[in-house]
Amino acid sequence: MNTYLRYLSCLVFTSAVVAGVLAAGPVTAAGAAVTAGTTTCSGTTSAPGVLTGTHGAVVVRGACEVNAGAAVVNGNLTVSPGSVLLAAFALNDKTGTGTSSLAVQGNVLVRAGATLVMGCNPANFACLDDPNPNKPTLSMHPTVGLDLRSNQPLGIVVHNFTVGGDVIQTGGGGGVNCTPQGVFKLFQSPVYSTYEVGSVGGDVRISSVQSCWMGVVQLQVANTVVMYRNQLADPDAIEILSNNITGNLICRGNSRTWDSGDIGAHLFPRQPEPNTVGRNRKGQCVLSSPTKPGGPHGPGPF
C-alpha cells in the first residue's frame, strides 16, 4: 500500500471509530473486577462490548474494544471466527480520565475471518481516540506474554507492541484484491495485515496470506523471519523494512518483496530501508529491491 493509502487507511479507521463505535454504548462490558475463568466480550460493530479489568481468559464474539482503562488477561485472549477486537485506544473513553491498555499473559489467538487491531503510536498508526489524527500525539503499547497466532484471519493490524513468543499468521486475508471487506468495509479501507514497531521474542512466520497489502516494519526479532507463499494485490507489497533480525530472513514464493518504501503516491521513487540480519538472507530477500522501474536487485543486501 503506498504511503498515501496507508495514511488514508489510518485516518478512516480513526474517523469511523470516533463517529460510530466510540459513540455507541456497550452490549457486554467485561468489567473492572477480577474475574476467574473465561470472560466473553461481545457486541456489534455499532454497539461493541468493552473489555476492562482483570480476567482469567477472554473470548471475543462479535465486536469488542479496549477503551475503558487497563485490561489484563492472565490466560489466552481468543478472537472467535468473524469477530473483531479493537485495542488501539490510548485513553479511558468511558470515564474521560486516565488511559487504556492491554496486557495478555498467555497467547492472543485470532480465528478464521476475524480481525485484530492492536496498538498505536504517532508515527505509524494514530490511536483510534486521538483527538487530532492528522497530528497525533497519543500511544498505546499492548503486550502479549506468549504467542500472537492467527489462522485464516481477515486482517492483523498491530503497532507499538511486544510479543514474548512467536508471531504466526497462516492464510486468510480476504483474497488477492483491494476491495474493502468485513470490518475494513466500515472504514473504507482495503484489507491488509501489518506488524510495525514491535519486539518479538521468537520467530515471525507469515504464510499463504492472500490480501491487498502487507508490512513487516521496524521489528526487533530474537529469532528468524519467514515469509512464504504470500500473494498480495498491491505491487507495493510485501514491505519488509528496517527490521533487526537476530536469526535468518527467509522469503520464498511471495508475489513480491521490498526493502524500500514508496515516497509518494506511486511505486517509484523509493526510499531504501534495509534490514539488519544476524545470520543469513535467503530466497527473495537476499539483495536489495530495485530503486527504479525495471531496475535490477542489489548490489546491497536486502
Q: For each predicted feature, which ranges?
A:
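Secretory targeting and sorting signals
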Residues: 1-33
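N-terminal segments that cap or nucleate solenoid repeat domains
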Residues: 33-82, 301-302
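Extracellular secreted precursors and ectodomains with disulfide-bonded cysteine-rich loops/domains
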Residues: 39-43, 62, 118, 125, ...
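Feature marks extracellular polysaccharide-active and adherence modules
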Residues: 61, 67-69, 74, 80, ...
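Short aromatic-glycine motifs in intrinsically disordered, low-complexity regions
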Residues: 63-68, 90-99, 131-137, 154-157, ...
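Acidic/polar low-complexity surface segments
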Residues: 84-99, 115-143, 168-195, 256-260, ...
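Repeat-based scaffolding regions
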Residues: 113, 153, 181-190, 197-199, ...
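Leucine-rich solenoid repeat scaffolds
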Residues: 237-302
